[in-house]
Amino acid sequence: MFLIRTINIDPRGCHDIDDVVSLWEEGGVWTLAISIADVAAFAALNPALLFAEKIGQTLYTSGGKALRPMFPLKFSEDIFSLLPGEERFAVSLFAKWDGTILYDIQWKECIVRNWASYTYENCKDCSEINMDVLYKIVTSLGEETGDTHKWVEYLMLFYNSEAAAVLKRAGAGLLRIHGEPEKELLARLESLSLPANELAYPAAVYATTDTVGGHWGLRKDAYCHASSPIRRYADVLNQEVLKAVLRGGQGTHVSYKHYALALNRLDKSAKAYERDCRFVDCILGAPGAPVHGIVVELLNGKTSIYCYDWKRMIRCKTGATLTMGDQVLIGFYVNMTTASWKNRIVYHVERV
């Protein structure tokens, strides 16, 4: 794929480039290729890299900087990364485009060269590939939008969905399972005009391929993580399966149930870290300034309140008599004498 024009679209300043996109016309037929950095090839040759399974995924600061990379920076931002002008191993999905749908899906192990790097802000000026055709393709995968973040998202969802189908047939790897939301809570949040999609949905989890269920939020019968192996260890495991299938095998003989349990624990911790970072940013951004909220639930002596400014739920004891739907004003201060930082934030709630 040296002569095929290929680009990446990522946030400004991104160095750990997982994915690149190619698009070309030959004989009147358009072909799309989505190529993902072949991290599994290096992990297989260097057992020391398997330490990444203890980390699970890269953690980022609120500004997008890698705070704790899953792999050493020399690997994640250099050896693995699909940097412009460099030749790299990749696991690629190829699909033909007939103007309406993508068809003739094929998987290949490739060597790719990234021709140019673009950001979400300037990628529409790309001259290496036909962006008008790419726009039509991503619209067929999702919905019509000028948001280039969504363009990349739709392409990765397509890659991951097709990868999940391969894993299911092979009976190996890790799927991403997402159950239906709690209907009672969903109805309550909708009645209060709150973001039900964010607050009522259960967290998606990793599971083995024999697990019943799909991804409710994405409306997929089967879905997996395979497009970010530099940043997530589940993607490395699934990439190993894809490569084994391409070579005529059925995947590696490992305990995927063990990996599912371990990665779910790490995933939960990572989400808590991201959530807490956003929360602390809010607290530090306006220390002591009261914020507005609405009462969502009263249970076991505690009140669940959605804070509009913080875009999150808090649970706390309140002295006031409140009912669901009450608008409240939340004051807070920090008590540094307690061990847990969450308990250091003391709330005072008043009905508006």
Task: Give residue spans per PLM region.
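Electropositive polyanion-binding surfaces
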Residues: M1-V352
